[in-house]
C-alpha cells in the first residue's frame, strides 16, 4: 500500500512538473519568432482581429488570403488580401500590426507612423527609416516580425 501511495505521489509530481514546464515554455518571456500554423488557436485569434478591423471599413464580410504572418513577443505583423465568398480579390493586399493585450489582439495604426519621403511605401515596403519610426511609435515591436524590404 505504501508503494502504491509513493508511486501515486511520484506520478502526481511528474504531472505537475510537466504542466509547469509546458506553461513556462509558452509564456511571453520565452516567446520565439514564429508563424502560427493554419488552424491553430493563435492564428484564428489574429485573423478574427483582422476581420474586426476589416468590418469597420467594408460593407461586406471577407475571408483573407494570408500573404505573410510573423508573431513574436505578443506582436504580430500580417499581410492579407481580402477575398469574397467565391475567392475573388476584393481589395488590395494590406499589412497590419497587432499587439496581444490580456489575450486579445488589438490593431495598431500603421498609417499613423511617419512615412518615408524617399519613395518607399511605408508598411507596404518597410525601409529602415520606416522601421525606426515604427519602433519609436510602438516601442517593443520586434524587428524580426517585419517583412524584409523589397529590392
Name each model-derived stretch.
Residues 26-39, 43, 47-48, 53-55, ...:
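Low-complexity, intrinsically disordered terminal/linker segments enriched in charged
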Residues 1-11:
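Bacterial N-terminal signal peptides that target proteins for export
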Residues 54-66:
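A short, amphipathic edge element
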Residues 70, 80-84, 93-96, 109-114:
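A mature extracytoplasmic/lumenal domain signature
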Residues 62-65, 89-95:
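Short, surface-exposed coil-to-beta transition loops
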Residues 94-104, 129-130:
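Short beta-strand segments and strand-loop junctions that repeat across beta-rich extracellular domains
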Amino acid at each position: 500500500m505504501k508503494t502504491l501511495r509513493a508511486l501515486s505521489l511520484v506520478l502526481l509530481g511528474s504531472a505537475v512538473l510537466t504542466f509547469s514546464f509546458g506553461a513556462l515554455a509558452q509564456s511571453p518571456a520565452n516567446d520565439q519568432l514564429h508563424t502560427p500554423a493554419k488552424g491553430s488557436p493563435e492564428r484564428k485569434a489574429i485573423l478574427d482581429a483582422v476581420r474586426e478591423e476589416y468590418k469597420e471599413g467594408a460593407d461586406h464580410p471577407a475571408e483573407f488570403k494570408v500573404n505573410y504572418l510573423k508573431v513574436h513577443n505578443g506582436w504580430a505583423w500580417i499581410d492579407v488580401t481580402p477575398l469574397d465568398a467565391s475567392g475573388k480579390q476584393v481589395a488590395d493586399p494590406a499589412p497590419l500590426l497587432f499587439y496581444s493585450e490580456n489575450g486579445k489582439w488589438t490593431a495598431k495604426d500603421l498609417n499613423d507612423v511617419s512615412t518615408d519621403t524617399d519613395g518607399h511605401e511605408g508598411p507596404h515596403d518597410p525601409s529602415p527609416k520606416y522601421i525606426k519610426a515604427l519602433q519609436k511609435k510602438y516601442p517593443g515591436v520586434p524587428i524580426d516580425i517585419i517583412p524584409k524590404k523589397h529590392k
